């Protein structure tokens, strides 16, 4: 409401077939906002409107979008986008609608940032990181590139612009031809990739087709910042549905469960 340009608040979702649609619905409900797809929105006279079920148009003052930049506005970015809103960028430029997560503000989603996080902690805080990153290499630097090329068979290579488990390549599962081709691509676009040591995920027992079976999993912890900072006694466990698969992302078919730590903290 502090940045609303006049009108209702909207959570823009790609639609019910998106793997995180339930989350989008929950966010809209908790934020007292309308959940909308591109079909529900229209730009007219440089302003954004929500089209109600009875045909009424309601002015939109702020949008929290749950889709990538490329798909946001087919007039500005990908012309084949069916989930974006034509003209929303122009309305934003004119100051007629606020986009809470503005275009281009996802710099921290760039996987290349992983490489610099420990360095940022040392530079800005003068401290050593308490939690270690997975050893990360940026082939933009010659020394890292040399190591990546010599050890690609045991590394995980990631396209920095991708998310949700897309653009992740396991050197151990690639053929010699695929590795040679990837090296050529990295040589042409070294800033586009990072490489990481493979971290062995913990196996948890999952109920698959009525039987317990091990699946790779990871755990996401949450830090709560209020008057003080504390670690939440729980988190989110994500797990792969296929045996031996390391991709636990929901967009890759992975599952997730709330996880609670029972007992008093020591």
Feature annotation, model-predicted:
Residues 1-266:
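Domain-scale recognition of functional cores that engage charged ligands
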